[in-house]
Curated annotation (Swiss-Prot):
One of its GO terms (cellular component) is spindle pole. Residues 549-558 have a biased composition (Basic and acidic residues). It comes from the Eukaryota. The gene is tacc3. InterPro entries: TACC, TACC_C. Keywords: Cell cycle, Cell division, Coiled coil, Cytoplasm, Cytoskeleton, Mitosis, Phosphoprotein, Protein synthesis inhibitor, Repressor, Translation regulation. Phosphorylation by aurka is required for localization to mitotic centrosomes. It comes from Xenopus laevis. Its main location: cytoplasm. Maternal RNA in oocytes remains in a dormant state as masking outcompetes eif4g to bind eif4e, thereby preventing translation. During oocyte maturation this complex dissolves and eif4g binds eif4e to allow translation of maternal RNAs. Plays a role in the microtubule-dependent coupling of the nucleus and the centrosome. Involved in microtubule assembly during M-phase. Involved in spindle pole assembly by recruiting and regulating ckap5 at the spindle pole leading to microtubule elongation. Pfam families: TACC_C (PF05010). Found in a complex with cpeb1, tacc3/maskin and eif4e. Interacts with eif4e and cpeb1. Competes with eif4g for binding to eif4e Interacts with ckap5-a; two molecules of ckap5 interact with 1 molecule of tacc3 probably mediated by coiled coil domains forming a four-helix bundle. This is Transforming acidic coiled-coil-containing protein 3. It is found in: Cytoplasm; Cytoplasm, Cytoskeleton, Spindle pole; Cytoplasm, Cytoskeleton, Spindle.
Length: 931
């Protein structure tokens, strides 16, 4: 029989047996094998005892892709719908305006931010060249910004500008721009980055009823208003919005001090850096380098070049001779005054619709804020910059209303977070610590370089924006205090955006001295309190966009202002010509004796002349007036009339000073110093200044229907024109003007109502769009987040699947190996069964043989016993026989011993006898010898 694997002691070193060690580990018994050598030959060799492990086979991988060479599901990620897809889809849109507006390319910028502050509290974030670090926002000095103002194009002949500067016209007002293009700027509350859909088209005629709430969301600076009037006056081309090159920011950081002085002293209307409108200009790198090298010269040339783009008339430009670095040593009253050029005569205006139709189609970038209708405000400067002391003019105000209003304004403006803050866009070169100096002149500190004042326009076109520029319920008496003529400017020009008050009390006094179109003539506080309640209610934060831009506007608008014709409804005379203005050298402060040098040596009685023209002026002083006429050496010649009705000055308190007079462009009138603070320059207060009870500022305005005396007429003509009319004539003229003002107020209210309706519609639409944008943003973010999560999970599942496949392949390999081993084990078991049967047969044979051997053993045992018995008997017989023989031998031996003993005795006796004989013989011999 043949055996395969018996046990460990019979197994050899076989590979098959080695693989069985895991499942069948034979144990050694230590017993010798009972198999025959022929059976041992059939066994495999005995394996070496070793501990083996179940190992998974490493799958084959592609040497290039390192992927497992097994079939698996393709790991293709799902096509995720990203925000870029929305951007690409939006870029493929081609929206169109109504038939009056031709379709133009759409510029869309979409970006998503996680920060979603309330869109109703955020102002419009314009796309300017600012680099604001909101983490270090408290350390920012907003009055020394590192970003250059968006000036006019640097040079008129620069190749980077796509349009000639002389043919460009800056930002159109909001109501006209709503027809010319649609620019949707998604505020930072929703997307934190603008989604601007921009259209440009042929401008249609603009009616008065198109005054919309865009004035609230898009505050226009003086240059923006002037641009609108420039569009009405001449057919200029609309300037393209061109992005500002990034190098400008770097140049601004390098030459910030230089740019602060030279930044647009004659800034063109195309850029309104004091407000939220920004008309970016394309500046190439070479332009930026030239701007860096020769900043001041470039800024001056820019101002001159862009001023010519407004109108063919020269623009008066003011220059102040002082060094801002030596500001502590400067005496503002000895700076020589503002060297103001003579203003040219105004020119007629053409109907706006006729001129706007001829404007060249250019895309104009405009931004809409569909908030809840707030005037887009700027956040006040960071509180860590230190508080400025109040000016004396603000400190002397008797009325507490401005303080209450300023507290409300401060609370209101303090609401926006630091992320919403918009850094003021003007740069200043004065120290705030100098405001406690009584000799400090805030208007002589270099000023900000802001766009010039606007041209005049019909009153009816702009009345809605007079009191409805904002819609918040908090009315500010301070804003109406410091800009009493702004209402008239808005009624006459319709587009002057009042500067925005920052909300701090110390800043309010600064804004009062720096309001747009303000002169330094004092305004009675009663005039502001007499304003109609409707105006106070609908003039929410008649905020001056920023105090700093306001101060810049005051000086800059006086420097590059094109004097338009005052558009009164029934004006009786035109503005004075260049010959009627004083020379710049005569604007210095001089004593009265030097002024009236021809015999009139006594000082002018200022108090009397100040009270002239007011309701405190009594007819009893006509005698005094006649005395002045009689003894005035200037009356030697016949009086000359430079204008009709030049004596018509207000004699009663007005609702607002600008309700009576139309706004005269600031460049035509210098800043007349306050009576109580500064001495009179060359008798200008004789020419129509009237007494005020407060130190606030008053705008020297041109009347809508009655002209004011020109303060720049020669001294003799001015005094003659002032004194030749009686108080009754002036009262009658003022009454007529007041009636006309009341009519205008009614029109203002009507336009207010229309504006409020449109404004509410815009507010609702803005809220809807804001919510819609927020929803879209949230949906996009959620979708993006879900897709990213799903993508991560899918990648994780794919990795797990791949790992499971690898494990499965290894398990399959291991299982196949185990199966083979199992088959071998089955074969081994069959061999063991066969061996068992063989062993059983052997055992039976062994038992039979054992029985036979036992029988043989018994037989052998009996035979051996018999043999032993016989041997024993023989041994006993031999023993007895030997015993008897031994006894006989012993007796014989004893007998022999006795013989020996007897012989020994006989020998001894013989020897003794021999010895005795010997001795005897010896003795005998001796004796014989002796003998």
């Amino acid at each position: 029989m043949s055996l395969q694997i018996i046990n460990d002691e019979n197994a050899g070193n076989d590979i098959t047996a080695e693989k069985f060690d895991l499942l069948l580990n034979p144990q050694t018994t230590g017993r010798p094998s009972i198999l025959r050598p022929s059976q041992k030959d059939n066994l495999p060799p005995k394996p070496a005892l070793k501990s083996t492990k179940v190992t998974f086979q490493t799958p084959m991988r592609d040497p290039q892709t390192l992927r497992i060479m097994t079939p698996s599901v393709a790991n293709k990620p799902e096509n995720v719908f990203l925000l870029e897809d929305c951007t690409q889809a939006l870029e493929q849109l081609h929206l169109s305006l109504p038939s009056s507006c031709g379709p133009n390319p759409v510029e869309i910028n979409v970006s998503v931010s996680n920060n979603q502050p309330d869109s109703e509290e955020l102002p419009v974030r314009t796309t300017g060249a600012y680099s604001i670090d909101f983490d270090n926002f408290d350390d920012i000095n907003p009055f020394k910004s590192k970003t250059q103002m968006l000036n006019s194009p640097i040079k008129a002949d620069l190749p980077s500008l796509t349009e000639n500067i002389e043919t460009t016209t800056p930002v159109v007002p909001a109501d006209e721009a709503s027809k010319q293009m649609v620019s949707l700027n998604l505020s930072a509350a929703n997307l934190d980055s603008p989604v601007t859909v921009q259209f440009s088209s042929e401008s249609g005629s603009i009616g008065v009823s198109e005054k919309t709430a865009l004035d609230d969301t898009l505050p226009l600076s003086e240059s923006g208003i002037k641009d609108l009037q420039g569009l009405n006056a001449s057919s200029n081309n609309i300037e393209e919005p061109v992005p500002l090159d990034k190098d400008i920011c770097s140049n601004n950081e390098k030459d910030d001090a230089t740019m602060a002085d030279s930044t647009c002293e004659g800034t063109s209307d195309a850029h309104t850096s004091s407000n939220n409108i920004e008309e970016p200009v394309t500046l190439d790198k070479d332009i930026c380098s030239s701007n860096e090298k020769d900043n001041a010269a470039v800024a001056d040339s820019t101002c001159e070049g862009t001023s010519d783009a407004q109108s063919p008339l020269p623009i008066p430009k003011s220059s102040y001779s002082f060094d801002p670095d030596q500001f502590d040593m400067m005496n503002p009253f000895k700076t020589g005054g503002s060297k103001l050029q003579n203003s040219p005569a105004g020119k007629k205006q053409t109907p706006p619709s006729a001129d706007l139709n001829t404007a060249k189609t250019e895309p104009v970038k405009l931004e809409f804020n569909f908030g809840d209708g707030d005037v887009s405000e700027r956040k006040p400067p960071p509180k860590k910059l230190g508080k400025r002391p109040l000016l004396k003019t603000a400190a002397k105000k008797p009325s507490p209303k401005p303080e209450i209003a300023s507290e409300k304004q401060e609370q209101q403006t303090a609401k926006p977070s630091e992320d919403e803050a918009i850094v003021p866009k003007a740069s200043y070169k004065f120290d705030w610590e100098k405001f406690d100096d009584p000799n400090f002149n805030p208007f002589g500190c270099g000023g900000s370089k802001i766009s010039s004042s606007p041209k005049g326009q019909k009153i009816a076109n702009e009345q809605p924006s007079a009191c409805t520029q904002g819609s918040k319920p908090e009315a500010e008496c301070t804003a109406s205090d410091m800009a009493p003529a702004e209402n008239a400017d808005e009624k006459d020009h319709g587009e002057i955006e009042p500067s925005q008050d920052s909300g701090a009390a110390e800043d309010r006094s600064q804004a009062e001295d720096q309001s747009v179109a303000l002169s330094k003539v004092e305004v009675p506080h009663e005039q502001t309190t007499d304003c109609s309640p409707v105006e106070n209610e609908t003039q929410p934060e008649v905020s001056l966009i920023n105090e700093e831009p306001s101060q810049k506007e005051v000086e800059h608008t006086s420097s590059d202002m094109t004097p338009p014709e005052i558009n009164g409804t029934d004006s009786e005379f035109k503005l004075a010509t260049e010959a009627d203005f004083l020379l710049a050298a005569d604007m210095d402060f001089k004593p009265a004796s030097e002024i009236f040098s021809e015999g009139f040596r006594q000082p002018v009685e200022i108090d009397y002349l100040e009270n002239f023209g007011t309701n405190s002026f009594k007819e009893s002083v006509l005698r005094k007036q006649s005395l002045y006429l009689k003894f005035d050496p200037l009356l030697r010649e016949s009086p000359k009339k430079s204008a009709a009705g030049i004596n018509l000055l207000p004699s009663v308190p007005l609702k607002c000073s600008s309700d009576l007079f139309g706004a005269i462009p600031e460049a035509n009138f210098p800043l007349i110093p306050s009576i109580e603070n500064e001495e009179k320059p060359k008798g200008l207060d004789l020419l129509g200044t009237f007494t005020v009870a407060d130190t606030a500022l008053l705008i020297v305005d041109a009347p809508s229907s009655v002209a004011v005396p020109n303060p720049f007429l020669s001294t003799s003509d001015a005094i003659v024109e002032m004194l030749k009319y009686s108080q009754k004539d002036m009262d009658a003229a003022i009454e007529a003007v007041r009636l006309e003002v009341q009519e205008k107020d009614l029109e203002v209210l009507e336009w207010k109502t229309k504006h409020e309706k449109l404004y509410l519609e815009y507010v609702e639409m803005g809220k809807i769009i804001a919510e819609f944008e927020g929803t879209i943003t949230q949906i996009l973010e959620d979708s993006q987040r879900q897709k990213e999560t799903a993508k991560l999970e899918l990648n994780k599942v794919l990795q797990e699947k791949q790992q499971v496949q690898v494990d499965l392949n290894s398990m399959e390999t291991s299982f196949s190996e185990l199966f083979k081993r199992l088959e071998k084990q089955k074969e081994a078991l069959e061999g063991y069964r066969k061996n068992e049967e063989a062993l059983k047969k052997c055992v039976e044979d062994y038992l039979v043989r054992i029985k036979k051997e036992e029988q043989r053993y018994q037989a052998l045992k009996a035979h051996a016993e018999e043999k032993l018995n016989r041997a024993n008997e023989e041994i006993a017989h031999v023993r007895s026989k030997a015993k008897s023989e031994a006894t006989a031998l012993q007796a014989t031996l004893r007998k022999e011993q006795m013989k020996i003993q007897s012989l020994e005795r006989s020998l001894e006796q013989k020897s003794k006898e021999n010895d005795e004989l010997t001795k005897i013989c010896d003795d005998f011999i001796l004796k014989m010898e002796k003998i």
